[in-house]
């Protein structure tokens, strides 16, 4: 081999190694100032609570993303109500009168749903689609969600709506309260943290909904009454949070949120947590702690 050919070979090898290193380095987890990766922090948190933790966070200011078990399936429980109401709002774009439509239901409908703090008070007069949507998001009213599901055509219609947004993981099969069984390995009524975060971003901040409908969804999320001890408990004082919680068997504890830091673009965050024992207690603190890790990482990165 001539000297020139040897030189070209050396250059090729050097370039290949450099590119390989760059490619591997680009997917390496971010390192915090303490030298600990955020995945390590999540793993330590997960091991301390004897469960499985799934996280996806998107900083829309720079598209920085943090994920942990982001592509694993988790039971979504009542966080799925975001997708149901998203489908309702989408339908209202072409049918503005839809939100004013009055739906009537029975006492049996509310009682069988397992939780109907708002819809249960309106059995005689019924509720508008708008009021039912608000109840489903802000109060996690199962009776309200079941009425919205029936109006849409059932859980499969919501799954189809998710597919129309490019979400191929969201799998809605059952109604309330059956969808909250959260049995390990059961793929019914599950999604991944990554898929849910991307769908939530499209619904609340992107182009999946027209501006009027998107603003309404944001307002309902901000008015949520069930999340004070979860993601909201993990953000600094003065930050605005719009979220939807979910709780189920096996200690399943979920929260999905859009977070608005002061004078900064929003953060989309999904935190899912589930355990191995059917009668395990929900754990709000793990959601708050995971949120703090995310905020610390994003804050540190923005200062560099």
Residue ranges and their predicted role:
Residues 1-11:
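Bacterial N-terminal signal peptides that target proteins for export
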Residues 10-20:
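Bacterial N-terminal signal peptides
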Residues 23-75:
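Beta-lactamase-like hydrolase cores
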Residues 25-45, 150-151, 155, 198-229, ...:
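Structured C-terminal helix/loop/strand segments within mature extracytoplasmic catalytic/sensor domains
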Residues 52, 146-200, 204-205:
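Mid-domain, small-residue-enriched loop/turn segments at the edges of structured enzyme/sensor domains
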Residues 63, 75-105, 269:
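Active-site SXXK
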Residues 90-110, 155, 159, 210-213:
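Short, well-structured active-site flanking segments
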Residues 110-147, 155:
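Conserved catalytic neighborhood of penicillin-recognizing serine enzymes
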């Amino acid at each position: 081999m001539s000297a020139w050919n040897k030189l070209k070979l050396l250059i090729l090898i050097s370039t290949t190694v450099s590119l390989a290193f760059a490619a591997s380095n680009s997917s390496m987890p971010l390192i915090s100032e303490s030298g600990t990766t955020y995945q390590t922090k999540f793993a330590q948190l997960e091991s301390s609570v004897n469960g499985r933790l799934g996280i996806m966070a998107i900083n829309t200011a720079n598209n920085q993303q943090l994920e942990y078990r982001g592509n694993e399936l988790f039971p979504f429980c009542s966080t799925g109500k975001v997708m149901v109401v998203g489908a309702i709002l989408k339908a209202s774009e072409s049918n503005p009168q839809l939100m004013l439509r009055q739906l009537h239901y029975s006492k049996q409908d509310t009682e069988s749903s397992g939780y109907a703090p708002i819809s249960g008070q309106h059995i005689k007069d019924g509720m508008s689609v708008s009021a039912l949507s608000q109840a489903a998001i802000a109060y996690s009213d199962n009776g309200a969600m079941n009425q919205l599901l029936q109006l849409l055509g059932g859980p499969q219609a919501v799954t189809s709506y998710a597919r129309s947004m490019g979400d191929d993981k969201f799998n809605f099969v059952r109604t309330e309260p059956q969808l909250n069984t959260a049995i390990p390995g059961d793929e019914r009524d599950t999604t991944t943290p990554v898929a849910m975060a991307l769908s939530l971003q499209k619904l609340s901040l992107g182009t999946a909904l027209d501006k009027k409908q998107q603003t309404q969804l944001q307002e309902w999320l901000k008015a949520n009454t069930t999340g004070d001890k979860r993601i909201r408990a993990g953000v600094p004082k003065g930050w605005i949070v719009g979220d939807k919680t979910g709780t189920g068997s096996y200690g399943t504890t979920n929260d999905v949120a859009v977070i608005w830091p002061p004078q900064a673009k929003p953060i989309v965050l999904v935190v899912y947590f589930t355990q191995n024992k059917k009668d395990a207690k929900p754990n709000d603190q793990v959601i708050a702690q995971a949120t703090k890790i995310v905020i610390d990482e994003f804050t540190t990165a923005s200062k560099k």
